[in-house]
Regions:
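Conserved alpha/beta catalytic core and glycan-binding cleft of carbohydrate-active enzymes
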Residues: 1-171, 183-186
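Aromatic- and carboxylate-lined catalytic core of secreted/periplasmic carbohydrate-active enzymes
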Residues: 176-205
């Protein structure tokens, strides 16, 4: 999360229009689920974190980040708040649950509705992940289309990445993580568009 990437090239940036704000996601995820595992360790999910993300964008603007054991991020000096893309779910974070569980499937519906209101009414650019607008029930898992030996390397790398989370550290759970190269992993991640008609209450929100 480097704020300077939003600056024009003559100021050392890449002239980007917007950037993910993982800090908002992480703070919200901890607030909703109470989970502070893996790279969520440095977040408390308190109201002040969420307010700071709405006011300033990145929470980490050069402070020490315990999980990475080094400073994280840089300031967003002079950048408009809408340059931060805020989200409760995206392809990375849903897939990083290992089994591809969507946030609304394991947190309080009341809290999830409140978090959605904060997301949509905040000054940043909100992102709704595929199917989030109608509470899609399908999982979204990490998938890739590689030939051997890269396919096995990616699968093993995925297991190693997930070991940072205590809930995925056991061998039994590791074995349950879907193979990214299996076509079924991709197919199970596709939306059931009929849910738009079945979940009309979610669309009304």
């Amino acid at each position: 999360q480097r704020g300077e990437h939003l600056l024009p090239p003559d100021q050392g940036g890449f002239d980007l229009d917007g950037m993910w704000n993982d800090d908002f996601h992480h703070a919200m995820r901890v607030a909703l689920s109470g989970c502070r595992d893996g790279y969520f360790l440095d977040y408390t999910g308190c109201a002040q974190e969420i307010l700071s993300a709405l006011k300033y964008g990145f929470l980490y603007q050069g402070q020490y980040y315990t999980w990475q054991r080094k400073p994280r991020g840089s300031p967003l000096r002079g950048s408009p708040r809408h340059a931060c893309v805020h989200f409760l779910q995206n392809h990375d974070q849903v897939a990083n649950t290992g089994l591809g569980e969507r946030l609304h499937t394991f947190v309080s519906p009341r809290r999830y509705r409140a978090a959605t209101a904060v997301l949509l009414l905040g000054p940043q650019t909100p992102l709704l992940f595929m199917g989030q607008e109608f509470l899609a029930s399908n999982r979204f898992m990490f998938f890739a289309d590689h030939e051997q030996p890269l396919r096995d390397t990616v699968h093993q790398g995925r297991r190693e990445f997930l070991r940072q989370f205590r809930s995925y550290a056991s061998r039994a759970v590791q074995e349950a993580v879907p193979d990214p190269g299996d076509e079924r992993t991709f197919m199970q991640s596709k939306l059931d568009w009929d849910e738009r008609n079945r979940n009309t209450a979610a669309l009304a929100l």
